[in-house]
Amino acid sequence: MKNSSRRQFIIASSVGLACTTIGTTANAASRSRIDSRIKIAMRELANLGPNFSKLINSSAGILMMPKVRSGGLMFGTSYGEGALLIGQAPVEYYSVAAASFGMQVGWQKYSSAMFFTSENSLARFRRNDGWTLGADLGYTMIDQGEVIDIDSNTYSDDVYGVIFGQEGLHFGVTLEGSKYSRITR
């Protein structure tokens, strides 16, 4: 097989894999389905440890994406729907989408949560029609084992993010560059 044929095969396979594994607006979840998934994800998040419960209770808002699908082979895509929670109640619904190119392979389903630790960071997020993680507002990713001493007295960043509940295997998963957009449900 020639290099150009091999390259075309890899590109076609990547696009095919991405198209078949990632949800689209045709598969958009209903409001009640999103709310149900959020309740399950919030319980799972709280069960990760007492400091996650503290972070949940002390945050000005939480952007919860209970089911994000990510997949790719060189070209990767991800998509999910969730809600912005204030006082642990959904106030607005959002989608998250990303596309990337580089060393990545596999498929994964996961949940993600972005904790807004101040009213100011929450207001900045809500003011924008769309929001790109890492470009529009800085954030710090939390490893599940790192939430040992994080509380409202030690916040040093406006936004903290965590990925949890992973199923499947996808090398190269990141939230960086993910685009969050308000949706109607």
Residue ranges and their predicted role:
Residues M1-G16:
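N-terminal secretory signal peptides and thylakoid transit peptides that target proteins
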